[in-house]
Amino acid sequence: MIERAGSHRLRALRSTVLSTLACAALLWADGALAQSPEDILMYRGPDREQKLIEGAKREGQVVIYAALIQNQAMRPIADGFGKKYPFVKLTTWRADSEDIVQKAAAEVRAHNVVADVVEGTGAGEEAVEANIAQPYYTPAVAGFAPAYRNPTGLWAPTRLSYYGTAYNTKLVAPDKVPKSYEELLDPQWKGRMAWRIGSATGTPLFLTNLRIAWGEEKARAYFDKLKDQKIVNFGAGSARTLVDRVIAGEYAIALNIFAHHPLISKAKGAPVNAQVMDPVATTAATMSVVKGLHHPHAAMLLADYILSKEGQGILARAEYFPVDPDVAPLPALAPIVPKIAGVPENFVGPDKLIKYTDSSEDIYQKLFR
């Protein structure tokens, strides 16, 4: 029997199509035809968590670069995440925010991305500035105050920081504690106050906070008076080190420090306390997802977990301030939370921090150097 060439070609084409469809079905079932990372990060469907879990099982790991204290916060986060998602290995690397973003950016430029997620004070906006962040959606931030959230989804807040003064209780009498920025101009504090230089959340944030809250004219008039107080420019260590110097009596008052640090030391018997002033400068540590990440499903599970009530509770117990309004801070630290202290708050978001830091540094150099 002689088979016509056209019939043969038709059967061959049908066989090819069926084989292709069968392979496609197998590949889809195996996850090889999964959504793009961008689609995964922005997925909002009702089956979102299940899709993330299925994808994370295939990925098997996730990497975060974070500024969280390792034993105090990151390890409990890793333990809790591991119990909830035992099929995902979490790898962490700790450094300060600037180093974290620099390392992640270098990886992106080299097309050798290791980090899936970066976290730290200002890290989100720095990642945006470095063009290494990409948008993501997480339902965990729905209950967060709108002021703390990024409308583009390029970062999400993980924890808050409140700034105030630390003062030595042996050197500053209770009735002499400065309770306003104007009271810092009292001549008795001339040469007895210090602030931290070399950090965006040190001297520049002090100046930025008042520039935003008061306006440039009023703030500059105040700075012109403040310069006569001969504030000591402290550059020999971290904000925590500066508080320790206050405890030691080297300085009577430290300006614009993390207000919970002196409270932690006070609880241990140190002669130090904190005072917040109107307006209280507030910043947020933020979390971004890195362009070119290899584990998008697991990265979203990790982001969801850190921002969940469980994750926020872990951070609260680690002496951080949660962003979730339903998660309370530790009672010993609560007095410096603006809404509890009854003092107005000025949230200096990552975008504002970056926008104002250079010009505030210029003011510092001209007036206080």
PLM region spans:
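Immediate post-signal peptide segment of exported/extracytoplasmic ligand-binding proteins
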Residues: 34-63, 82-83, 186-190
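Extracytoplasmic ligand-binding site segments that recognize negatively charged/polar headgroups
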Residues: 63-78, 90-108, 112-250
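A ligand-binding cleft/hinge motif common to bilobed small-molecule-binding domains
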Residues: 124-127, 252-271
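Periplasmic-binding protein-like
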Residues: 146-147, 160-163, 191-199, 223-229, 233-236, 306-329, ...
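A bilobed periplasmic-binding-protein/Venus flytrap-type ligand-binding module shared by bacterial periplasmic
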Residues: 164-171, 207-212, 283-298, 314-315
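Extracellular/periplasmic bilobal clamshell ligand-binding domains
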Residues: 329-369
